[in-house]
């Protein structure tokens, strides 16, 4: 198999003499010196790092270099099953002892206590654990220790978990999942990966002997395959001492079973797969070229980093070209991209992927191949390379700026890849210096040679995925082969570069407004009132050195838009239009080029009762961010040619989504909740037919024609003196009327009374989905918000125990608790879950759901659940207050909704009780509003 990276080595080797010594790519790169890396005598590896963001918190991971690929033919799905069993009892923490303990200190199942299984690895994690006392550290180490070698795997618990995992299979086995499984025999032809099944089959999960699971655990879970990772506000020396002493009894195997690297066979002729599914969301083509992986011993070298820089530049330039094509009105594909990624431990790949309109996968693939052919024949331009270099370095500069502000979780992935794949753990400041040393030596001719070398005639795989629907044509294998020949013989012209040098916004033509008053605001903020009626609330922070977040909101939204215009600003339509439209004289492609080297993310929105702009970026690009906010409000683009591409995307996807049972469930939920209110119409083919650019423009200009009453919140590392002229120029000049903008009561309230909606749909994987909704008119206060969040937390715990653990009837019930203040204050508690479609199981599950919530309303929740909820809410608040996003939301809540979510929060949480929650829920339910919605398989 072609060693793509080795070829790159040879192309670059001649240049290495010119590198400065500090940047010599033949030398190994340095691991972050703050990371303590050790290996015990039994083979266990550990990584420990101190970091105090957030304070008094830590991450604990056990990474096991074992996954589904280690299963034999009798063990399909057992690597994943084992992950579940680790949470069901260990030697030192039997039963639910571990989860109960962690919940008692504020952790929650799913958010802070979780695990994940892949083909190659399994991870167990405890996230954001409060380090309030030494005993918590000791217990978390004990949990990792028991995961590593002392999971009980009790046969009785295994039998109880079978139902949970079978229901997980029902939930996960969507059309996209089935297409993924169907693609494996083509992607991995001739290897074990071709039949590797992450979750198993219903029949296998029902019948496997407990001994098989115990054998898998004993064979593969051993210290030479494992790494313990601990990052947080801890003493590194203390943790290392405790870890080494505790894990000393984890036995190294006397006769270890070797973990083999499984090869993927080469192929001279393209392997071509054509796969379909009735519930597929879209048509796609994946085209990959396999190559050998870089040997482990080469991965720590600077040369490996340099190769990855080359790959990043090639993929970014190619993806910019694909994006430019996709935005054209006659685009041959909806979207396409190139990336480089291993498909196994033994096989790397150059990966092209596209999505197309149904029935047009062949012409889309032919167009993609022509672009690939252009790349190999003509290469890239110097302007393209300069842009991606600038953006790459700007990203690294920002990471270096924010080095001291990284959260604990941000360190973990680099430690995992160091253990599993031998890549170095780079400190961002050091990485920036390395990249600076390499950058001058990356030349266009080398880039273009690499682009040529990565496209080879052998080891190609093409997988076409399509909805299985009457009238949708799919290509044959010989047509795919013919497409390769046509591209190779095509008459082509090199890519032509177009760049505009005009300013994004002509500041000289703008009449600035003025700050007419200044005063102190809440939460250490400052308030500037502008001459056009805009209120600007600024909170300077140092939570992240290179970050600023801005939100602009004015009343109105869809509530004041003519009803016939509402479909044209439906969320999906509006989002795709704004992404493809650009601003002023810049279409989307030109705008992206104009913003080279800038960290400025700005997007307009129109919601039910307000419209505005959300923005984030770097403080050094603050003027650019302000210019974009101004441009989206004053200089939007409504070009018919630019509207065709997003509409083509929507028209291609929506008909397929309508065949998806989960989509149907969401549609029926919205219809039932709001009694078919036309201002809450869920996206559908019928809605798409009502969309027009004329109505979109009419609605948009209506929403943004008057900023009087707009509230703009600015949070982050901002200099007030530097900010003020930008605010006066770009915000003070926005159009306003004499009267502030208002929102209107659109009548979109949750239906009252008792309502049933039971329906059937055709589905490939039979399951029943049940949604129960309680609603009530309640005042939007912080006290009630805390009660709603408490009810959600308590019901989550109750249903994990009753529906999942005791009944084994679902993978999980999702509980949502929402409180809105427009058009009227109204709360909603929503419970949704999937289960076995038999009538008996449905009836039992419904009975449990109702009994749990009614018992809590009658008698109040248990003291245990209340205590766990309070600890979790207080813990989460402590973590959130060091984020700019939290304070941006707090300021918006205060100055737009009149609600202080900060000052009394801790006191309110500490004072909730079994009685107060029970009384709240009782009053909520007794209003008598209940929706029972269910989706069953059509026979």
Language-model region placement:
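Hydrophobic, small-residue-rich alpha-helical packing segments that form membrane-like cores
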Residues: 162-212, 216-225, 229-231, 236-243, ...
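Feature representing long, continuous alpha-helical segments
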Residues: 308-312, 316, 320, 366, ...
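M16 family metallopeptidases and their MPP-like homologs
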Residues: 47-49, 54-71, 77-79, 96-146, ...
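Short, structured secondary-structure elements
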Residues: 119-123, 160-167
């Amino acid at each position: 198999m072609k060693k793509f990276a080795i070829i790159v080595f040879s192309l670059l080797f001649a240049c290495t003499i010119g590198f400065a010594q500090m940047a010599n790519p033949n030398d190994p790169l340095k691991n972050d010196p703050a990371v303590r890396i050790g290996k015990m005598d039994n083979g266990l590896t550990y990584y420990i790092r101190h970091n105090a963001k957030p304070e008094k918190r830590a991450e604990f991971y056990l990474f096991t270099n074992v996954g589904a690929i280690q299963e034999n033919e009798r063990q399909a799905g057992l690597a994943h099953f084992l992950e579940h069993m680790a949470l069901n009892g260990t030697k030192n923490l039997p039963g639910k002892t571990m989860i109960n303990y962690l919940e008692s200190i504020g952790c929650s199942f799913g958010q802070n206590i979780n695990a994940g299984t892949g083909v190659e690895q399994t991870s167990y994690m405890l996230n954001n654990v409060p380090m309030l006392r030494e005993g918590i550290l000791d217990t978390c180490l004990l949990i990792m220790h028991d995961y590593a070698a002392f999971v009980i795997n009790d046969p009785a618990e295994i039998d109880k978990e079978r139902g949970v995992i079978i229901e997980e299979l029902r939930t996960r086995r969507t059309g996209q999942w089935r297409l993924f499984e169907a693609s494996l025999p083509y992607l991995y032809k001739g290897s074990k990966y071709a039949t590797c099944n992450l979750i198993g089959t219903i029949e296998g999960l029902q019948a496997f002997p407990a001994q098989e699971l115990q054998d898998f655990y004993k064979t593969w879970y051993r210290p030479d395959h494992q790494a313990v990772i601990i990052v947080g506000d801890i003493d590194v020396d203390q943790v290392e001492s405790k870890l080494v002493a505790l894990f000393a009894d984890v036995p190294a195997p006397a006769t270890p079973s070797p973990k083999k690297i499984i090869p993927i066979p080469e192929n001279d002729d393209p392997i071509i797969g054509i796969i379909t599914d009735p519930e597929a969301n879209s048509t796609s083509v994946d085209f990959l070229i396999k190559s050998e992986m870089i040997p482990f011993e080469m991965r720590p070298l600077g040369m490996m980093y340099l190769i990855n820089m080359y790959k990043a530049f090639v993929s970014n330039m190619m993806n910019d070209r694909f994006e430019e094509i996709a935005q054209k009105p006659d685009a041959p594909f909806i979207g396409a991209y190139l990336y480089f990624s291993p498909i196994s431990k033994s096989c790397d790949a150059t990966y092209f992927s596209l999505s197309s309109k149904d029935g047009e996968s062949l012409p889309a693939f032919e167009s993609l191949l022509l672009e690939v052919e252009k790349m190999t024949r003509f290469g890239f331009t110097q302007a393209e390379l300069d842009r991606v270099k600038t953006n790459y370095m700007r990203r690294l500069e920002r990471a270096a700026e924010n080095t001291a502000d990284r959260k604990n979780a941000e360190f973990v992935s680099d430690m995992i890849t160091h253990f599993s794949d031998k890549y170095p753990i780079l400190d961002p400041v050091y990485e920036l210096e390395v990249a600076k040393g390499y950058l001058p030596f990356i030349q266009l001719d080398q880039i273009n040679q690499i682009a040529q070398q990565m496209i080879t005639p052998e080891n190609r795989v093409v997988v076409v995925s399509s909805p299985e629907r009457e009238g949708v044509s799919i290509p044959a294998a010989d047509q795919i082969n013919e497409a390769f020949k046509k591209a190779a013989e095509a008459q082509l012209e090199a890519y032509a570069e177009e760049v505009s040098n005009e300013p994004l916004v002509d500041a000289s033509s703008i009449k600035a407004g003025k700050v007419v008053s200044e005063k102190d605001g809440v939460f250490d903020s400052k308030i500037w009132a502008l001459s056009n009626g805009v209120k600007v609330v600024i909170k300077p922070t140092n939570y992240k050195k290179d970050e600023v977040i801005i939100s602009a909101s004015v009343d109105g939204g869809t509530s004041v838009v003519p009803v016939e215009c509402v479909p044209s600003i439906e969320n999906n339509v509006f989002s795709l239009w704004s992404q493809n439209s650009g601003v002023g004289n810049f279409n989307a492609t030109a705008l992206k080029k104009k913003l080279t080297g800038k960290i400025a993310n700005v997007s307009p929105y129109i919601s039910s009762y307000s419209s505005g702009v959300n923005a984030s970026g770097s403080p050094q690009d603050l003027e650019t961010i302000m210019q974009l906010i101004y441009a989206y409000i004053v200089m939007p683009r409504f070009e018919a040619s630019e509207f065709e591409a997003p509409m083509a995307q929507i028209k291609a996807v929506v008909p397929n989504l309508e065949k998806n049972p989960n989509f149907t469930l969401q549609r029926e939920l919205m219809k039932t909740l709001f009694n078919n209110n036309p201002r809450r119409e869920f996206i559908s083919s019928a809605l798409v037919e009502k969309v027009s650019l004329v109505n979109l423009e009419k609605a948009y200009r209506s929403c943004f024609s008057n900023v009087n009453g707009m509230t703009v919140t600015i949070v982050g590392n901002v200099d007030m003196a530097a900010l003020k002229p930008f605010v006066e120029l770009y915000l003070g000049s926005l159009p306003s009327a004499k009267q502030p903008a208002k929102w209107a009561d659109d009548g979109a309230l949750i239906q009252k009374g008792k309502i049933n909606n039971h329906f059937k749909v055709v589905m490939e994987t039979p399951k029943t989905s049940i949604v129960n909704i309680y609603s009530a008119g309640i005042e939007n206060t912080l006290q009630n918000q805390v009660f709603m969040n408490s009810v959600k937390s308590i019901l989550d715990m109750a249903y994990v125990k009753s529906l999942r653990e005791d009944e084994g009837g679902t993978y999980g019930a999702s509980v949502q608790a929402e409180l809105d203040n427009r058009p009227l204050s109204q709360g909603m508690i929503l419970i949704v879950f999937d289960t076995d479609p038999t009538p008996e199981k449905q009836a039992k599950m419904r009975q449990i759901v109702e009994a749990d919530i009614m018992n809590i309303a009658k008698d109040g929740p248990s003291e245990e659940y209340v205590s766990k909820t309070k600890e979790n809410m207080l813990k989460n608040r402590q973590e959130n207050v060091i984020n700019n996003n939290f304070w941006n939301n707090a300021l918006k809540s205060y100055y737009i909704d009149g609600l202080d979510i900060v000052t009394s929060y801790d006191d309110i949480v500490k004072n909730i009780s079994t009685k107060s929650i029970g009384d709240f829920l009782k009053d909520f339910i007794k209003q008598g509003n209940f929706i029972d919605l269910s989706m069953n398989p059509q026979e």
